[in-house]
């Protein structure tokens, strides 16, 4: 079983299509039931039969717990794609929007990882946390966005130390700019014509997650060309 959060759009939706094409058993989640239904509508009847859908707000601990309580056995992989963007000069940013940015990106990651570790730290589960290249370098007019992504990176790297000796693996993913609906709600007017598509990023990520007997990719940066 593969669990994909943030599956209602962007990379999460693209990953859903990629894994569904391979007849994988999936549990997909996002905030919007309507958007999740739209993702499912793009799949064949046979692909849909392998997928469970659960709308959830991952900023709420109870809903995170309810999501994973649906599973009768530990998942093989959890891909946490949920998040949002918000950009602009710091002095012009709205305090409420900043709080929402922190909640959507950092709080959700903390609550999801907390739930996964409490349930599955003694199981062979690959936990993939999708961040951004904004977690690797500062960017003008992206100060708060970079801040929350750096915080998630710190969370992942610290938790790896706590999980030393555990069969659970944390995999950090840093994708560059993708041409998705992400930008329309971010407050940043940007030309995405040269950005990679979500499908391109999903293919690269899916391929990178194929482990061998003695090795796996622990950190992956997906740069746009």
Regions found by a protein language model. Give the residues of each.
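Substrate-binding pocket helix/loop in short-chain dehydrogenase/reductase
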Residues: 89-90, 94-102
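Residue(s) in the substrate-gating loop at a strand-loop-helix junction
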Residues: 132
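C-terminal helical subdomain
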Residues: 172, 188-225
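Conserved glycine-rich Rossmann-like NAD(P)H-binding loop of the short-chain dehydrogenase/reductase
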Residues: 24-38
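Conserved NAD(P)H cofactor-binding loop of Rossmann-fold oxidoreductase domains
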Residues: 81-87
